[in-house]
Regions:
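Acidic donor-binding loop of glycosyltransferase active sites
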Residues: 54-55, 197, 209-224, 231-232
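C-terminal "capping" alpha-helix adjacent to the active site of nucleotide-linked donor transferases
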Residues: 257-264, 268-285
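Glycosyltransferases and closely related glycan-assembly transferases
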Residues: 11, 43-57, 63-78, 91-99
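A short, well-ordered alpha-helix in the C-terminal region of glycosyltransferases
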Residues: 285-297
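C-terminal alpha-helical cap of glycosyltransferases
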Residues: 279-282, 296-316
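Active-site-proximal region of nucleotide-activated glycan assembly enzymes
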Residues: 12-13, 72-132, 137
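Conserved nucleotide-sugar phosphate-binding/catalytic loop shared by glycosyltransferases and other
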Residues: 1-39, 45, 264-266
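Donor-nucleotide binding loops and adjacent catalytic segments primarily
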Residues: 5-10, 131-216, 248-251, 263-272
Length: 316
């Protein structure tokens, strides 16, 4: 998916390296993946030596680790942590980074003197969405409020199942756009007022513009896009059984700020989902008001300032 998203962008050269996944649990792959990381470091060193960047920017994830280790001493390193608490990859890369940008101000306590509160970068194309184009794409008239449901590129099966079970009741009040994830489309459903797509990229800004409320997981990048667009959301974070708990913390922060409602997956049923969606819609104006007063929703300029500062220091 990553290559399909960035491979054709003007001015972007896509490189691949070997990388081992960083796990907090026992797996036989833990015996082999360290060798992939070492191999990735040497591959990244060759690429960096050829490209000779003025600065290296890391957004986290296990693929970033060999790149950042390789870049140490070859170029300034700026890392960015999206979540409320640093993930394992960013805990490692922060040791090598010159600056660590954070999305949440509270995260500064985890990264020390290198930290700078910037917010998170928001894709500029999201601001160019058009409601009518979104309606035309989905075939909806716009007479009913629109619920946009998204669970990331891989989807969220628990949300998919609860939503589909509640469809007959929900579609009485809402038109529903469902981004269900790769391989999770159910062609047996022919419910008026319901459209489903495995994954959307180009048309996503228009779907955001058409949506009145959003149902989603609580990944930091996604929820800050909702904040930047002032879209009220019902957040169902990944449970601890399937994550390190970062989405639970992200969702809790948004709930405390009055930006979103949360529903634990353990309490997710068609009935609780139905009630929560209606509650979210009824309270949407208060959420919009709270979000509209946040000046840190889009951290693009702040992150760029840090990157430029480090790059200019390298050039000097």
């Amino acid at each position: 998916i990553e290559k399909s998203l960035v491979g054709d962008l003007e001015g972007v050269t896509y490189h691949t390296i070997s990388a081992g996944k960083l796990r907090r649990y026992f797996s036989l792959k833990n015996l082999t993946d360290p060798f992939k990381v070492v191999g990735g470091i040497f591959q990244a060193k060759r690429i960096i030596n050829k490209v000779k960047p003025d600065v290296v920017f890391s957004k986290g994830g296990f693929v970033s680790v060999p790149v950042v280790i390789a870049a140490k001493g070859m170029a300034p390193i700026v890392a960015h942590e999206s979540d409320y608490t640093p993930g394992l990859a960013n805990k490692i890369t922060a040791r090598f980074a010159d600056r660590v940008c954070v999305t949440f101000e509270d995260t500064l306590k985890y990264v020390g003197a290198k930290g700078v509160h910037t917010g998170t970068p928001i894709r500029p194309e999201l601001y160019g969405g058009d409601r009518q184009r979104g309606l035309d794409f989905t075939g909806f008239s716009g007479e009913k409020p629109i619920l946009l449901t998204m669970g990331g590129s891989q989807g969220a099966q628990a949300i998919n199942d609860a939503l589909r079970s509640a469809l007959p009741r929900l579609t009485r009040s809402f038109d529903i756009i469902h981004l269900c994830g790769k391989g999770k489309k159910d062609d047996s459903i022919a419910e008026p007022g319901y459209v489903q797509y495995e994954y959307i990229s180009k048309e996503l800004p228009d779907l955001f513009a058409a949506a009145d409320i959003i149902l989603s997981r609580a990944g930091a990048n996604a929820i800050f896009e909702f904040l930047a667009l002032a879209k009220p959301a019902l957040l169902i974070p990944l449970p601890l059984s399937a994550s390190r708990g970062d989405q639970i913390l992200n969702a809790g922060y948004f709930a405390r700020k009055g930006y979103a409602m949360t529903l634990d997956q353990a309490g997710l049923t068609p009935d609780t989902l139905f009630d929560s969606i209606h509650d979210l819609y009824d309270r949407r104006l208060s959420f919009i008001s709270a979000m509209s007063g946040d000046s840190t929703a889009d951290g693009t300029d702040e992150v760029l300032d840090v990157i430029r500062s480090e790059a200019e220091g390298s050039i000097r």
